[in-house]
């Protein structure tokens, strides 16, 4: 117990120290929100990766999808790496940096307002962020209760409050730079932790080969492959179609999430983009692939305490139960690992929410003529507000809020992905097409919440994203275009000449 507590104390002390160190970078709006747009490849890549994966993934999704799809759930992690990281950096990274800097936009709603010349779009986008990002913020605490109960026998509410307080301290003090530096430290913990845990868990089952053999003997209880042995060790698992929906939602979804795309706003230069692409992809393979691979063995640890009174599986309990027999030192590493994942995601979410509310809604609408210093102070106050709100919701979420948690990822990505990506590449996107994407993304996910015309909320989110990719070009072809001169001026940012060394690019003959 003493070792586990010591690890926690050291971890929190480092987080706060980084916040104090990063204060010098948080004196301006650009510095507080984007780290002065000069963050290097390692910090940006780790900020992207650690914001991607929280306790929701490690404790919730890994247990739930590992139970449902067996070892095939590893495809989710690989999809996160290839689509959610590699392709996201390649397709969005450079153009996001160039165009947002040209437009001087600091948030995704601000981008919509400037790119499509519509204050109404900017305000609506900020409202969508507020409505769906706050419940998602509260969801990062999910899974902590069982894990801390197993490791320390500490009540859930104290875990939530402690995590929120320490996260708030370093975000308020150092803004984006403190978040990025802490993300780097947390990445090291997550990387070492997940490898150690996988090796320890498999060793407890007689090694990798024996664990596979035992898994292969478990008959499928999924309707499409009912009773078949070997389904949970097959290439695509017992239910490939629903597995595909999970891959699309958790991988393609990052392309439209403000807290993820915002990392590209802050990146420093071309070298940072190239290096960051490789680092973030490798990070996702190890962390996300490792989490889902570990969860894929969940059925080997089935026990009565993992079922409720009605006999239903308690998915959040699977991973903690798998880890309960590990030595104290490894349990301590796991606790710090999950805390790292959750705090990095929480920091990114509250920073995104506070900057969006301050810069896209309060500034120039409610609070006129805000000075640079006042904007930073307001964002710091909003960080406190959002963290307190997330704690209140996490303690006892109302039914509707709990439902919003389940659809927030799909609603945000469904609304924003298509108009953001197309807006970076295609001059022909119209204002009406952006409105249509907002309506489709939010409409499909929210209506499905009430009418259940799509059985799985995850599939509903995936369909919302794909719908946006279809709706935007179709509506753009049928509706009036934006002013050509203005659009040409925006896209001229890609034609500006830059000088680079020959080690970065060969000259044309």
Predicted regions and their residues:
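Membrane-embedded helix-loop-helix hairpins and adjacent transmembrane boundary segments
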Residues: 1-509
């Amino acid at each position: 117990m003493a070792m586990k507590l010591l690890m926690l104390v050291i971890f929190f002390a480092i987080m706060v120290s980084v916040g104090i160190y990063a204060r010098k970078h948080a004196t301006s709006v650009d510095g507080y929100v984007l780290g002065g747009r000069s963050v290097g490849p390692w910090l940006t890549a780790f900020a992207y990766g650690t914001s991607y994966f929280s306790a929701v993934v490690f404790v919730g999704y890994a247990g739930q999808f590992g139970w449902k799809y067996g070892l095939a759930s590893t495809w989710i992690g690989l999809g996160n790496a290839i689509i959610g990281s590699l392709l996201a950096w390649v397709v969005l990274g450079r153009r996001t940096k160039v165009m947002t800097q040209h437009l001087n936009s600091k948030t995704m709603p601000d981008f919509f307002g400037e790119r499509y010349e519509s204050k109404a779009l900017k305000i609506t986008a900020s409202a969508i962020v507020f409505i769906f990002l706050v419940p998602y913020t509260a969801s990062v605490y999910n899974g902590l209760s069982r894990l801390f109960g197993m490791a320390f026998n500490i009540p859930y509410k104290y875990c939530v409050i402690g995590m929120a307080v320490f996260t708030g301290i370093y975000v308020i003090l150092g803004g984006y730079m403190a978040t990025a530096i802490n993300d780097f430290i947390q990445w090291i913990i997550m990387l070492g932790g997940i490898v150690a845990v996988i090796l320890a868990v498999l060793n407890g089952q007689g090694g990798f080969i024996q664990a596979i053999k035992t898994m292969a003997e478990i008959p499928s209880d999924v309707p499409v492959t009912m009773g078949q042995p070997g389904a949970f060790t097959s290439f695509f698992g017992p239910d490939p179609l629903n597995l595909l929906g999970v891959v699309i939602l958790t991988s393609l979804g990052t392309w439209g999430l403000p807290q993820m795309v915002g990392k590209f706003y802050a990146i420093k230069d071309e070298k940072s983009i190239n290096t960051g692409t490789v680092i973030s992809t490798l990070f996702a393979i190890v962390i996300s692939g490792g989490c889902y691979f570990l969860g894929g063995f969940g059925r080997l640890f089935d026990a009565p305490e993992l079922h409720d009174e009605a006999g239903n599986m308690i998915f959040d309990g699977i991973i903690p139960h798998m880890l309960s027999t590990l030595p104290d030192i490894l349990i301590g590493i796991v606790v710090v690992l999950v805390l790292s994942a959750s705090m990095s995601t929480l920091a990114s979410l509250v920073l995104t929410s506070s900057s969006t509310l301050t810069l896209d809604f309060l500034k120039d609408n409610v609070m006129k003529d805000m000075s640079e210093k006042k904007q930073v102070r307001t964002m710091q106050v909003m960080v406190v507000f959002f963290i307190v709100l997330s704690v209140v919701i996490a303690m006892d979420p109302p039914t509707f809020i709990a439902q919003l948690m389940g659809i927030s990822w799909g609603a945000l990505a469904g609304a924003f992905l298509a108009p953001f990506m197309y807006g970076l590449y295609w001059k022909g996107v119209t204002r009406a097409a952006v409105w249509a994407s907002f309506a489709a993304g939010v409409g499909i996910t929210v209506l499905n919440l009430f009418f259940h015309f799509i059985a799985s909320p995850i599939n509903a989110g995936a369909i919302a994203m794909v719908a946006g990719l279809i709706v935007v070009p179709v509506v753009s072809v049928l509706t009036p275009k934006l002013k050509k001169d203005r659009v040409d001026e925006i896209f001229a940012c890609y034609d500006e000449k830059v000088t680079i060394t020959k080690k970065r690019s060969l000259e044309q003959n």
